[in-house]
Regions:
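Active-site phosphate-binding and catalytic loops of NTP-dependent enzymes
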Residues: 3, 75-79, 94-99, 116-122, ...
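N-terminal accessory targeting/assembly segments
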Residues: 1-86, 91-95
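Residues that form or immediately flank small-molecule/cofactor binding pockets and catalytic motifs
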Residues: 18, 48, 92, 113, ...
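P-loop NTPase catalytic core
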Residues: 134-439
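Residue-level signal for beta-strand positions within conserved beta-sheet cores that form or flank
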Residues: 9, 39, 64, 83, ...
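A generic structural signal for well-ordered coil/turn residues at beta-strand boundaries
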Residues: 9, 17, 30, 83, ...
Length: 439
């Protein structure tokens, strides 16, 4: 990033840590960019005339007499229709070999939308994954996390959602990705011919961890452009928010801030909320919906990152491996969409809420039957039928590799009801039984 002529140059750094450096400077703003010995940095703390800079590439090789030049602006992204189909790094620079994007330069990390300009979410976001669309329906303008163990195929799930989701634009923000994961997303999107509606901002494990902090703001700035300027439905996919939080912790620790729970900074809640609160439904029709992966350490849902996330978001989606079918499913017991009632049975078929509730109840009966069997108790005929139903339900609907529309999901569920149960055991309104029961 080039500097301008006649800019003031500072050459006396008072303190250097692994990720930050401090010096005395005046007329500097918070979040302002700077060049330190040729490396890009950003102002993260101002105390009087003492300014602390976060150096994205790390401070290795920077002497105390290094030249520091402040650029007079925060990180920016050039927004235009040319963003579509492109891959960028954390600074909004192309990494796909394509040309630079021409467009309006916009500062990233702006405020969330004023509540008076928001509309209550009311549009269905269909993903083709029954564990989401059937049981935990997503609504435009919603913010919801995917909780998953690090060894689960959450990136494949995100890629599937990107290809199947019925939205105008998909924006992927990848933080701490391996090169294999980056190439996986790139190849999947290219082979599916879907690049024209997908925009990706990627930080890999080969890039400095601190750069991850820019990825969500880059992705959301692009999302705001398409949602506001073009009134489009935009789905933002962020993976992995735990990597983002780890980068926050790195900067916080190297600034000698007192850590909070699980070594995370005390500002973690605000840092996460600033991202998630960008989800919005505009009265004009445009919307930003956020799905973000949060990996769990040893399945610990009480860790500071998922714990704070749960207070901010409108539900959560849990991935787990089902030992009976050997596939990863969306767990119906631990998953929840707090806004599904806004579209379930209204934007979908009228029998949707009752079918969803009945299926989950029968799946719970199967879980109880499995516990009885494991403890050596005899199973009733109903228990055996419930277990058989649960296996088919997981395989044909809950598994993440299943791709159906909501009407097909409901029809498959009705087929399973009639295969294993009597109408009175399913406990659904007679008008729906008369119309949809498979005879």
């Amino acid at each position: 990033m080039a500097t301008k002529a006649f800019q003031k140059i500072y050459t006396k750094i008072s303190q250097i840590t692994k990720a930050t450096c401090s010096l005395k400077a005046t007329g500097v703003g918070y979040d302002e960019l700077a060049m330190v010995n040729g490396k890009l940095a950003q102002v993260v703390k101002i105390a009087g005339d003492e300014v602390t800079l976060q150096v994205f590439e790390g401070t290795e090789g920077i002497p105390t007499n290094a030249e520091v030049v402040f650029l007079g602006k925060s990180p920016t992204l050039k927004v235009s229709d040319q963003l579509a189909g492109r891959f960028f790094n954390a600074f909004g620079e192309p990494i796909d070999g394509g040309p630079e994007v021409e467009g309006t330069e916009v500062e990233i990390g702006g405020p969330s939308v004023n509540p008076v300009r928001r509309k209550q979410p009311s549009e269905l976001i269909a993903t083709g994954i029954a564990g989401i669309d059937l049981n935990n329906t997503l609504v435009s303008g919603q913010k919801i996390p995917f909780f998953a163990d690090p060894d689960q195929t959450f990136n494949q799930v995100m890629a599937n959602v990107a290809l199947r989701a019925e939205t105008d634009k998909i924006i992927l923000g990848g933080m701490g990705m391996t090169n294999d994961d980056y190439l996986y997303f790139k190849n999947v999107f290219s082979n599916a011919g879907a690049l024209d509606r997908i925009i990706s901002f990627v930080n890999t494990t080969e890039n400095p961890p601190v750069e991850r902090l820019l990825i969500p703001d880059m992705a959301l700035t692009a999302a705001e452009y398409f949602a506001v300027e073009h009134n489009q439905k935009v789905l933002v996919l962020l993976t992995d928010m735990t990597s983002y939080a780890d980068a926050l912790a790195i900067v916080s620790n190297r600034m000698d801030q007192i850590p909070s729970k699980d070594s995370m900074p005390g500002s973690l809640y605000s840092d996460l909320a600033k991202i998630y609160e960008k989800a919005v439904q505009f009265p004009s029709g445009g919307s930003i919906t956020i799905i973000a992966v949060t990996t769990l350490s040893g399945g610990d849902i009480t860790h500071a990152v998922p714990d704070n996330t749960g207070y901010i978001t409108e539900g959560q989606l849990f991935l787990r491996r089902d030992s009976d079918i050997g596939k990863v499913i969306v767990d119906p017991f631990r998953s929840l969409s707090r806004l599904k009632q806004l579209v379930s049975g209204k934007k979908t078929r009228k029998d949707h809420p009752q079918v969803m509730n009945a299926a989950v109840r029968l799946y719970a009966d199967a879980a109880n039957a499995k516990t009885k069997m494991e403890n050596g108790f005899d199973l009733t005929n109903y228990d055996e039928r419930a277990l058989a139903f649960a296996k088919d339900y997981a395989n044909q609907l809950l598994a993440i590799d299943v791709n159906l529309n909501t009407t097909e999901m409901l029809d498959v569920t009705w087929g399973l009801f009639s295969k294993y149960f009597k109408p009175e055991e399913v406990n659904i309104k007679k008008e729906f039984v008369d119309q949809y029961w498979k005879k």
